[in-house]
UniProtKB/Swiss-Prot annotation:
The gene is rimO. It catalyses: L-aspartate(89)-[ribosomal protein uS12]-hydrogen + (sulfur carrier)-SH + AH2 + 2 S-adenosyl-L-methionine = 3-methylsulfanyl-L-aspartate(89)-[ribosomal protein uS12]-hydrogen + (sulfur carrier)-H + 5'-deoxyadenosine + L-methionine + A + S-adenosyl-L-homocysteine + 2 H(+). PANTHER family: RIBOSOMAL PROTEIN S12 METHYLTHIOTRANSFERASE RIMO, RIBOSOMAL PROTEIN US12 METHYLTHIOTRANSFERASE RIMO. GO terms for molecular function: 4 iron, 4 sulfur cluster binding; aspartic acid methylthiotransferase activity; metal ion binding; protein methylthiotransferase activity. Keywords: 4Fe-4S, Cytoplasm, Iron, Iron-sulfur, Metal-binding, S-adenosyl-L-methionine, Transferase. Binds 2 [4Fe-4S] clusters. One cluster is coordinated with 3 cysteines and an exchangeable S-adenosyl-L-methionine. [4Fe-4S] cluster 1 binds at residues 42, 78, 107. This is Ribosomal protein uS12 methylthiotransferase RimO. InterPro entries: Elp3/MiaA/NifB-like_rSAM (IPR006638), Methylthiotransferase (IPR005839), Methylthiotransferase_CS (IPR020612), Methylthiotransferase_N (IPR013848), Methylthiotransferase_N_sf (IPR038135), NA-bd_OB-fold (IPR012340), Ribosomal_uS12_MeSTrfase_RimO (IPR005840), rSAM (IPR007197). It is found in: Cytoplasm. SUPFAM superfamilies: Radical SAM enzymes.
Length: 472
């Protein structure tokens, strides 16, 4: 079951996925049990939104995509960087102006005083993954409607905010690392891994409902199970080890694409690469490296042996030649010198990463990094950002060019009057490039087709269909 959520008038300024809703209509009548929902931020937050929406539907509430139709609006906020805070506050403001009855949840909700200073009229505020508290507040202001649950059955997969052919699967909450630029542990707590059996049950339901791509997410995916103390769980009557490699192996047996996100560079990441080489999970590694200067990495409290990272990249590619590596970096970190930045550029040129995101350091309220060294001016950060992206654009173009002439499986995401738009194993939704198949207007979202790559640039691929699987 998919639902529509509002699209705030303020467009996103973030380089991360944002699921939003349609603009409010001006002529509407409320029924007393309609809830509007604004979901901002990363895929982990989107999963939280899906969970809240699912329970609302189970409780008999309707979900509307209009402010005017809504009896109450929930805003699930992001508070990771200043731009996210600003956007979240703007979304709350708009919801108050358009509707007036607003509950705020999510990461920014952990900073209630900050929200109250700007928006004192918000009804209630909860922090991240406070599902029961959100529902309790909804029941308070919009009493649970009387309904027959057998006439409004919810699919086993619950409410989804993604297209029906792919879904995010969150395997844990929180993080045990203490990177100095990050406040996630203070917002979401330490690592709390879900039982493996619960994860595999959810994945099975997703695949049985038609999901063809499972995107595994958490704050620290490769740390999955570290908090379990080596204890096994059970699934289908069999013991299952609770670590990321064992979990990935089980997920890979379900017949869908499995894509891993947010892989912290622990040594045991090596164990995942053979699974990619075997074809059990996609040969796609999203591994945020953040910087390459040992001095800056030490200040960030990140792994600082860049030589080992380069050796690992070479080793991974030898084991799995098709491996696509995505990473993110921060430029303008406090105390970053031109020498540090040049080390980062040299690393890019040597590592030849496939997909790279770059963020200018943001002085996140509460981050230790704000006070450990002199802050970098906005002009310098902007200059380094553009120089970084210029270097990476050439590398990305080179890496994508290797696909020209090859035939790949393409998962179709959208079709318009010009043709179909899809993704290969090398492309995660929302954040990576796309594969354009011009003229193929008869294809449908969710179809998996074989297509020969004919052209590439630094972001995207173009292809011609060779064969199509007509099953959605």
């Amino acid at each position: 079951m998919t639902v529509e959520t509002f699209k705030p008038k303020q467009t996103t300024t973030l380089d991360i996925p944002v699921k939003t809703l349609e603009a409010a209509s001006t002529n509407a009548v409320t029924t007393g049990n309609r809830i509007g929902f604004v979901s901002l931020g990363c895929p982990k937050n989107l999963v939280d939104s899906e969970r809240i929406l699912t329970q609302l539907r189970i409780d008999g509430y309707e979900v509307t995509n209009s402010y005017a139709n809504a009896d109450l609006v929930i805003v699930n906020t992001c508070g990771f960087i200043d731009a996210a805070v600003e956007e979240s506050l703007d979304a709350v403001r708009e919801a108050l102006e358009e509707n007036g009855k607003v509950i705020v949840t999510g990461c920014l909700g952990a900073k209630e005083n900050q929200i109250r200073e700007v928006h004192p009229d918000v009804l209630e505020i909860t922090g991240p993954h406070s599902y029961e508290a959100v529902l309790k507040h909804v029941h308070k202001y919009v009493p649970k409607p009387e309904h027959n649950p057998f006439t409004s059955l919810i699919p086993q997969t619950g409410v989804k905010l993604t297209p029906k052919h792919y879904a995010y699967l969150k395997i844990s909450e929180g993080c045990d690392n203490r990177c100095t630029f990050c406040i996630i542990p203070s917002l979401r707590g330490d690592l709390d891994s879900r039982p493996a059996g619960s994860i595999l049950d959810e994945a099975k339901r997703l695949v049985e409902s038609g999901v063809q791509e499972i995107l595994v997410v958490s704050q620290d995916t490769s740390a999955y199970g570290k908090d379990k103390g080596g204890r096994t769980d059970f699934w289908n009557g069999m013991p299952v080890k609770q670590d990321i490699t064992s979990l990935a192996r089980q997920l890979g047996k379900m017949g869908a694409w499995v894509r891993l996100h947010y892989i912290y560079p622990y040594p045991w990441v090596d164990d995942l690469i053979p699974l990619m080489a075997e074809g059990l999970i996609l040969p796609y590694l999203d591994i945020p490296m953040q910087h390459a200067s040992p001095r800056i990495l030490k200040m960030m409290k990140r792994p600082g042996r860049v030589d080992r990272q380069l050796e690992a990249i070479q080793r991974w590619r030898e084991i799995c030649p098709d491996l696509v590596i995505r990473s993110t970096f921060i430029v303008g970190f406090p105390g970053e010198t031109e020498e540090d930045f040049q080390i980062l550029l040299d690393f890019l040129k040597e590592a030849r990463l496939d997909r790279v995101g770059c963020f200018k350091y943001s002085e996140v309220d509460g981050a230790v990094a704000n006070t450990i060294a002199e802050l970098i001016s906005e002009d310098v950060k902007e200059d380094r950002y553009h120089r970084f992206m210029e270097v990476q654009a050439e590398i990305s173009a080179e890496r994508l060019a290797r696909f020209v002439g090859r035939t790949l499986d393409i998962l179709i995401d959208d079709v318009d009057e010009e043709g179909a738009i899809g993704r290969s194993f090398a492309d995660a939704p929302e954040i990576d490039g796309m594969v354009f198949i011009n003229g193929e207007t008869e294809l449908e979202p969710g179809m998996l087709v074989r297509a020969r790559i004919t052209h590439s640039d630094e972001h995207d691929l173009w292809a011609e269909v060779v064969d199509a699987d007509t099953q959605d």
